[in-house]
Amino acid sequence: MSKFTNKTLLITGGTGSFGNAVLNSFLRTDIGEIRIFSRDEKKQDDMRHEFQAKMPEVADKIKFYIGDVRSLESCRGAMHGVDYIFHAAALKQVPSCEFFPMEAVRTNVIGTDNVLTAAIEAGVECVICLSTDKAAYPINAMGITKAIEEKVAVAKSRNSGKTKICCTRYGNVMCSRGSVIPLWIDQIKNGNPITITEPSMTRFIMSLEEAVDLVLFAFEHGENGDLLIQKAPACTIGTQAQAVCELFGGKKEDIKVIGIRHGEKMYETLLTNEECAKAIDMGNFYRVPADNRGLNYDKYFKEGDEKRNTLTEFNSNNTRILNVEETKAKIASLAYIQDELAKVGK
């Protein structure tokens, strides 16, 4: 973490689960300052009190900026002296974005453009934009706007001066805000049925710590315009629900199938067939370089493009599929789950 020594890091949408994970990982390092940029003063105040209580010796490294990525001036006001940015601000609830698609455009697309414009103007060294598997072959408003966010990042990277811009794309982050596992735990505690959409649906799963690791990998190894992807495992929704039931004493027969929600897919994709043509296998990660050809395609009428796919689409059906015991182990390793199990005496 030597590159963060005495540096200033700005996290947009910083009061969310990702921002909390970064603070837990970074605060006790020699980083200079972490700026939390978000629009909800209540969440900022809650975060301030939380970290003053649990890390009083380093909590003064956190600085809070109220603002909104939808406003370019708001973004500019938080950029002075910033070295690095983790851009996590987003509207990410699939059904909500289906009903309010223009709100998703304003935050996920225009907001990203504002953050990158302000960062380039301020001479920020590196910006990592957080994207999602729903941006690959998108069928819902959330995924479509995140796909455009990725396009905006690549376009901005072509004229970004000294600012390096990369994107990360990852799957479902377990126990992040608005995710399904905390809902299931509450349902079990209250003696209610555990509601799932479709048991055979598959989803990539990763922890918040793995999400932070992916961003750090992009920071260290990404080049301007790159997209970085982690090779995450997956499980079915039915397996995940059964794992949570077994951990918290729920009954398998209490699992209730309610049907697929607005805009959901049966499986998700992290690396598309089209991206495979240029993707570079980096062990536990894929790196997809930006397509920086100009708009002059005349030569391709004569020469063509010799690149051919050497990889195949990486999706939640063809990755490593975890069974119930493996899924239980992964879920049980999470700090949130350990705290919840302690509350119920397990």
Briefly describe each language-model feature range:
Residues 3, 121, 151-172, 179-346:
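Strand-loop microenvironment adjacent to phosphate/nucleotide-handling motifs in alpha/beta enzyme folds
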Residues 7-29:
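N-terminal Rossmann NAD(P)H-binding glycine-rich loop of SDR-like oxidoreductase domains
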Residues 12, 79-88, 129:
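Rossmann-fold scaffold of SDR-type NAD(P)-dependent oxidoreductases
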Residues 64, 104, 165-168:
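Hydrophobic/aromatic anchor residues within beta-strands of the central parallel beta-sheet
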